[in-house]
Every structure is written in structure tokens, then in C-alpha cells.
């Protein structure tokens, strides 16, 4: 058994600092101005300010980093602190550090479509670094409706003339291929691709990165990672909660846009892509684009849509269905669950179904990749053997394990299912790594774009799903109902069986969710 390693947060941060400071792309001595556009909003309050605080607390930001909030609301830094501090989870011992953090914060009031406001912002930023070399990082925590005006004004007025400029853009990146192309063309006309960071919070999960190492650093997997040995691949993203009063926003996009076309499609690329020439960002993203180009538009016959209804035995939120959310339009047919089958039409994966499924108000919280291997040829054990599976689970508890057949103790050849545990968490016990948001923000400071979506990736992803989305919006099919807290609609299980997946509900492994 591997020796267990227990590292404190201080030790982990020390290792990360050493890695960062040895990285030429991490300009430790430079002045950095981190500008939060939309600083008065929920995203800034709940995610961005807390993330910047955690990085500052742990000494993972360049020493001369200043944070500037920008929004229309008449606020002060004290107001920002009151709004965001409850999400910082700061301990009493961290109060002095917290006060130091807010001395590096400032707030500028301005309009999003007013050139004069941006001239004022630019003057303020320049005063911070007093004409010295400085790098500007703009986080657009804004609705997409104002992206065009904001990016145009930033490019015309607020760009650093002495350092680098980087723009962080939040999803959704459009609603379909046409709107996405329109937004991409606009942003690409203003900034180079190496300045654009389209953030997908899911892409920097530690286990998502580990998938690449698992595939390409272990010879044992290379010969079997193909359609000759794998019968199907299942990519799952399940949430145990519903819209919880925020259905109005969700109803505009639905589960396909929210999860499937983004998170799950990115996971599919990492499973299916060929080995990149290097681990450089563009080499990895080149291979992901090649995979996407091999996928045809999703066919309606290979899609199941569902919408949760209240659980008659449930309590609180579980007793309510999607349509009981007062913010959801009456009679909405928006899907809260979707299962779709895609095929990668190349030599490695020809004929192998990639089953994508995601949903809200399901029976558990889980995100995983499951590769199910083909049946044993020439079975001598009287069909008692189950299919082998390799499971890479991202949440809730990161795990890597494979299910295998071993002999049951006794006189005769009775196979039974067991696990071969590859989970690195068993070795690195209680090691707390930075979360996805922290890692992604650090990537922006370092100029690493591997975990950000490139323009051509975005275009290919929308190409695959746009015809389906338009058909759904045009015809408004009634989604299959499923009870809050269930596995989802039974029709989805039938679709999975139809394309070759075998459900093994009898096996109870050691990896509880």
C-alpha cells in the first residue's frame, strides 16, 4: 500500500509558491491590476472576491497586485467588504491579513456604455502604478448583453501600454452557433486569442487534469483505450438540488446549454483525444478540436429530455417540481435533465457511443467518466463475468478505480466483482488543493490557457448542439417527468441500454458517493 502523505495547507501553498516563482510566465515582480467589471453583482460577491482573497491569504498572487472593482452602483470598498466577507470564511487569526487585503482594493463607479467612464477608470488604474510597468487583467462578471460595449471600451481606453492585457469572459458564450460566432467575432476583432480567457469552472478540477496523466503517462492504458476494447463511455453530471427559486435564469438556457454543451463536451474531449505533442495549452486544445470535428450534429432520436416533478414523499424543496418555482414561466417545457448519445467518427472510436447525461434534482451529487469494456470473448465461466469498468470521479469525492473479476473464496471457480483502487487521495490524505476557481485565476496570472475554451473549440461545440436546440425551441416537446430525488426518467436508462450500456446496479463498491 502506498505511503500516506499528510500536508498542511501551509505546506501545500509553499509547494505551489515554489512552482509559481520558478515559472517564467508568472511575473512575480510586476505590478498587476485585477479589474472586476460588475463588482456589485452576485458572482463577484460570492466567487471572485473570495477567490482573490484566498490567493492573497496564501501568498499565491504577485506581491504588487491591486484589485479594482467597477460597476454602476454607488458603492465603496467598505460596502464591497460587507457584501463579500461572509463568503471569505476568514478565521479570527486571519483578520490582520484580511485588513491588509482590503487596503489593496478600490472601487470605481461608472457606466458600461459610456466612454467617459472608461477614461476615468483608466486614469485611476494608471495612478495606482504611477507610470511603472503594469499588467491589466479584466474579469467580466457581467451579463453577455453588455459584453460588446464593455470590451470595445476596454480595448479603446483601458489597455496597458507597458505590460500584458488579459480578458476573462464568463459563460454563457452565446445561446447557439450564430450568437456565439457573433460574440466571438466581436471579441476577436479587439483582442488576440492569447488575451482571451473563456472560463469554464469545471475544466480545472484536479481529477479532470489527472485524466490526461492517467491516459498518457501509463502504458497499460494505451493499447486498450479504443473501440476494440471499450463498448461505451458514460459522462455524468448529477445535482441533487433543483432550481431553488432561481429557475427564471435557468429557464432561459436549460440543462443542455448549462452543462452538456460545456462541461460534459469538454470531458468527452479529454477522454477521446489523441496524445498531444506536448502539454502546452495549444497542443492540448488542438487535439480537443480534432475530436469535436469528428462528431456529427446530435440526432433527435438519440436524446431524452426530462423535467423534475415534486416528490409526494419529499419535504421542503424536494416536494416541489420545476414548474412550482415561482420564477419559472407557467407551462415551461425547459428540460432539467438530458441524456444524449454522440459518436466520434474516427479510427479509434468508430461505433462507440459516448453517452452524456446531466440533470438537476437527482438522487445524488456526482460527476464522473465511466468507461465500460467489452464482454470477455470465449467466456468459460458460464456468463457469470461482469464487464470491467474504469471510473474517474471528479465529485463529490475524487476517485479512480476499476472494477474487475476475481475468484470468490471457496472450492470452485466462482467469479465475483471487486475493485482495483487507483485513487491518489488514498496517498495524499487530507491534502487540500486550491479549488477550481482559484486554479483558474492563477492560470490567468500565469498565462496558461489550457483550461480555457478557444474560439474554434467553442464554434465546434455549438455546431454539434445548435440544430437540436433550435428544434427543441421550435417544437417545444414535452419533457419526460421524473420525481425529485430519483435517477431521472426511465426513458434515459432505456436509451443507454439500446446503445449498448449494461447497468450493474447489484455491485456495491467501497467508493461511496
Curated annotation (Swiss-Prot):
Entry-annotated residues carrying Phosphotyrosine: 503
Tissue distribution: Testis.
Coarse class of the protein's main subcellular location: cytoplasm
Keyword rRNA-binding: no
Any GO MF annotation of the entry: NADP binding
HAMAP family in the cross-refs: G6PD
Protein name, per record: Glucose-6-phosphate 1-dehydrogenase 2
Organism: Mus musculus
Source lineage: Eukaryota, Metazoa, Chordata, Craniata, Vertebrata
